[in-house]
Swiss-Prot record:
Residues that coordinate or bind Ca(2+) 2: E600, Y694, D697, E699
E.C. designation(s): 1.4.3.21
Residues with 2',4',5'-topaquinone modification: Y493
Signal peptide (residue range): 1-27
The protein, known as: Primary amine oxidase
PTM comment text: Topaquinone (TPQ) is generated by copper-dependent autoxidation of a specific tyrosyl residue.
Subunit structure: Homodimer.
Keywords from the UniProt entry: Catecholamine metabolism, Copper, Manganese, Metal-binding, Oxidoreductase, Periplasm, Signal, TPQ
Length: 752
């Protein structure tokens, strides 16, 4: 039976009952209480579509796909007939349903997508009640101060071996639920560990020399500071702006330049670049160029205004929401699953085909997939303990006053989980997707539900295999994929992350960038203008008076692979041309040079797509005696030029602070506190506290519990086709079984 949210059901019915009426249609021997269909189902979270040709409603909610005609006594739910107690009734041109319609249809038992969790997984996200409890316990501590804000409240993970024992054998984890709490007391970062079961603070640790994340209320603070500044208002007049209320501010981290930017290292600062709202819905198209305000968040004031030559604000309207366009007419494309989903969701566990994995949301890195296993002919085999975005950076290459500091650590500085963008069915994800709400804590410590935070859907992905033998019947089968999709909007850019599970054991990781380019105002209208060459030194002229500045989107994924067990080894296979010594007319042969990469510093390397890198379990073999392995492919194609490394000189501070950018493969020994490639507190960090630090001690990787980190991404050279809104541009990575199985895994089980 489908388990649906009682809170949502109650809300939908409460709203609907306020405008209900009695119908002569009878249910259970009495008059039915009728409520408006559109309002009731939309408040419940379902999509309502009307097919004028078929004279039929289509209702979509998570795992249920319902078709029903007005007046009919039956509905079709996932391809199966369901008798209705009360038909849909049309009155005054509107559809009405009984107040039992939601329960009758969406809890009919025909949709088996959601199952009851009988044994809570030890990695389940903190519930709203647990978040509130953690905050109450922390606030009761003697050292807590009233104006303290919360950066992150998340599950403190139990011991890894105990979690695997639970996932593989069902052994309960003998540890109380606990929370990690990160706070900001003014500019001071504090970490606390809270025992939720025994309601006490286990540790309280001030963190020295750390700048915390930028929190959502910092955005409002900056806007208020700018609006209240008479000094800034005077500077705006140089740019032809007399009304400061039309100015939109974007608070940005200031980076680190060893004092060469004239900023105090211990101050909590943001740099503010601004845009003019001209009423077209796209203020990004109207940059106020060469104007930067430096705001001190503690003093609540502008401490410095940095200026360059005055550039007129580009004023041409550039809406991207379709207000000035005629929408193309396209016929509907319906994706239906008439017999229901091929996957089930039990609590936070997903089961599809032979895959099982746990899914939870983190306010910094978004979805975390855990205890990933593959059922190989009845044996549950370990593949990955945890996989998630580790971190990312978007560095720009322009040295001008409004650009030189721009290197956005989107997850580490802003929290990409917090900035999750609700997914729109039929646009951001296909109509057959299940959309999951997620709960995190806001900066006040209040539990906040993000609606439609994650989409899960199955899709057709071409042929899995095919062979047409001459004169024989065709042999082929379709490829299916299960996709876990999450979208985060960080300022002008929207990032789409897909975890793609293949039936054949492959896991794809796709990162897509869309949204609005960060653009620079310039003098040139066309490339024939006198200033065009200088104006486009660091970018492309993509509109009159607008340059798209060259930058990079660099993603790093933390992948704690446990290939058939926790102890693994990094193996290299390099195809080589070698002389033919076996005789015959050939002078050369293709051979594989295979060797072990046995330490962390040796493992940190550029990715050569002509070579093979494996994480192998040298203690396990397939039936041919080959060690079971997974291939690591940091870059498996994309639609922009690949980022082969950081486009910065080695003497740049950003290069020293964030070395994860420049190598596509890193492998480190497992340590539970090593989670972020940019380090735990990267904002204004003065040296590398991430992967460069993790690999510094050069620990052995040979037959140990190793963690793989892959860096991938693109160098973004702007083009006109990406303006005023950018089509999604993808970078793809893969984890692929390599002698992990004994044969083609999608052939199916052998007949008895």
């Amino acid at each position: 039976m489908a388990i649906l949210s009682p809170r949502k059901t109650a809300l939908a019915l409460a709203v609907a009952l306020s405008c209900a009426w009695q119908s002569p249609a009878f249910a259970h021997g009495g008059e039915a209480h009728m409520v408006p269909m559109d309002k009731t189902l939309q408040d419940f979270g379902a999509d309502v579509q009307w097919d004028d040709y078929a004279q039929m409603f289509t209702l979509i909610k998570d795992g249920a796909y319902v078709k029903v005609k007005p007046g009919a006594k039956t509905a079709i739910v996932n391809g199966k007939t369901l008798e209705l107690q009360v038909p849909v009734v049309m009155k005054d041109g509107k559809a009405w349903v009984s107040d039992t319609f939601i329960n009758d249809v969406f809890q009919s038992g025909l949709d088996q997508t959601f199952q009851v969790e009988k044994r809570p997984h030890p990695l389940n996200s903190l519930s709203a009640a647990e978040i509130s409890a953690a905050v109450a316990i922390v606030k009761a501590a003697a050292d807590f101060k009233p104006n303290t804000r919360f950066t992150e409240i998340s599950l403190r993970e139990p011991d890894k071996k105990a979690v695997w024992d639970f996932a593989l054998n069902g052994t309960p984890v003998n540890a109380p639920r606990a929370a990690d709490v990160i706070m900001l007391d003014g500019k001071h970062v504090i970490e606390a560990v809270v025992d939720l079961q025994n309601k006490k603070v286990l540790s309280w640790t001030p963190i020295k020399d750390a700048h915390g994340m930028v929190l959502l209320d910092d955005f409002a603070s900056v806007q208020n500071i700018i609006n209240a500044s008479s000094e800034f208002a005077e500077v705006l007049k140089k740019h032809g702006i007399d009304d400061p209320s039309k100015v939109i501010t974007t608070p940005l981290t200031v980076g680190y330049f060893d004092g060469k930017d004239g900023l105090k290292q211990d101050a909590r600062l943001l740099k503010v670049v601004s845009y003019l709202d001209v009423g077209d819905g796209n203020y990004w198209a109207h940059p106020i160029e060469n104007l930067v305000a430096v705001v001190d968040l503690e003093q609540k004031k502008i401490i410095k205004i940095e200026e360059g030559p005055t550039i007129p604000v580009p004023m041409a309207a550039r809406p991207y929401d379709g207000r000035d366009r005629v929408a193309p007419k396209i016929k509907p494309l319906d994706i239906i699953e008439p017999e229901g989903k091929n996957y089930t969701i039990t609590g936070d566990m997903i089961h599809w085909q032979n895959w099982d994995f746990h899914l939870r949301m983190n306010s910094r890195v978004g979805p975390i997939l855990s205890t990933v296993t593959y059922n190989d002919n009845g044996k549950k085999r370990q593949v990955m303990y945890e996989g998630s975005l580790g971190g990312m950076i978007v560095p720009y290459g322009d040295p001008d006053v409004g650009w030189y500091f721009k290197a956005y650590l989107d997850s580490g500085d802003y929290g990409m989980g917090t900035l999750t963008s609700p997914i729109v069915r039929g646009k951001d994800a296909p109509s057959n997707a299940v959309l999951l709400d997620e709960t995190i804590a806001d900066y006040t410590g209040t539990p906040t539900t993000i609606p439609r935070a994650i989409a899960i859907f199955e899709r057709y992905a071409g042929p899995e295999y095919k062979h047409q033998e001459m004169g024989k019947p065709n042999v082929s089968t379709e490829r299916r994929e299960l996709v876990v999709r999450w979208i985060s909007t960080v300022g002008n850019y929207d990032y789409i992350f897909d975890w793609v599970f293949h039936e054949n054991g492959t896991i794809g990781i796709d990162a897509g960038a869309t949204g609005i380019e960060a653009v620079k105002g310039v003098q040139a209208k066309t490339m024939h203008d006198p200033s065009a060459k200088e104006d486009t030194r660091y970018g492309t002229l993509i509109d009159h008076n607008i340059v798209g500045t060259t930058h990079q989107h660099i993603y790093n994924f933390r992948l704690d692979l446990d290939v058939d067990g926790e102890n693994n080894t990094l193996v290299a296979m390099d195809p080589e041309v070698k002389p033919n010594t076996a005789g015959g007319p050939r002078t050369s042969t293709m051979q594989i040079n295979q060797y072990t990469i046995d330490s962390e510093q040796k493992a940190a390397q550029k990715f050569d797509p002509g070579t093979i890198r494996l994480l192998s379990n040298i203690t396990k073999e397939n039936r041919m005696g080959n060690p079971v392995s997974y291939q690591i492919i940091p870059y498996a194609g994309g639609t922009h030029p690949v980022a082969t490394g950081a486009k910065f000189a080695p003497d740049e501070w950003i290069y020293h602070r964030l070395s994860f950018m420049d190598k596509q493969l890193w492998v480190t020994r497992y340590h539970p506190t090593e989670r972020f490639p940019e380090g735990k507190y990267p904002n204004r960090s003065i040296h590398d506290t991430g992967l460069g630090q993790y690999a510094k001690d050069d620990e052995s990787l040979d037959n140990h519990d190793d963690v793989v980190w892959i860096t991938t991404g693109t160098t973004h050279v702007a083009r006109a086709e990406e303006w005023p809104i950018m089509p999604t541009e993808w970078a793809h990575a893969l984890l692929k079984p390599w002698n992990f199985f004994d044969e083609t895994p999608t052939l199916g089980e052998k007949k008895e």
